[in-house]
Amino acid sequence: MKFVPSQEEVIAIANTGKYRVLPVSCEILSDFITPIETIKILKNVSTHCYMLESVAENEKWGRYTFLGFDPKLEITCINGEMKVGNIKFRTQNPSENIRQILSEYKSPRFDYLPSFTGGLVGYFSYDYLSYSEPTVRRDTVDNEEFKDVDLMLFDKVIAFDNYSQKIILMVNMQLDEPETGYNKAVMELKNLARLIRTGEKKDEDFGYITGEISQLFDKDGYCSMVEKAKRHIHEGDI
């Protein structure tokens, strides 16, 4: 496997002092496995995995399928209580805290890599808007207990290139010790390729219905709610 950039190029970039991390990558053919099969392997070694499809304008199928596992950091916030890793604190502006975290992982762009080479993956709930727009805070009971924001920081990325039928493996290395970091990244890339080739797939546990299915409202009630929502949208309330 060829690893890019080279160690000499990494050291030169590190000496500029512009970046703190850098993606080292290699490629393997994808003719022996699919993204779905790969995510089953990842689920067998980590409880935190993701799969994202890229999409571009006027494309029916995106070029890349991104997969990741074993996040480096978890970030959550609910009702102003933020948790970054094992550290908890109160905040009125989680966006500011998230931007600060991202600033510590600034990395260079390479033309031969897809636009996503690692970073935060997760969701922002509807209630997240209330931090910048307090008027949207709902006064109903939150039975679902969804977090306002739930993100994970991934420094290893598996990207299926659906156009060229190859898999791009990426590991983000720290640039404070470029030689040591590069050797570690290369070792992780080799381990990642080995995992994809030989890893065991996790058996899926399918759910099943344990009780009767009941509807919350009838068709007329549903249509009435839709019409009411449409009026609110037309009037600018939503």
Labelled PLM ranges:
Residues 1-49, 54-91, 126, 130-238:
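Extended accessory regions or peripheral subdomains of proteins
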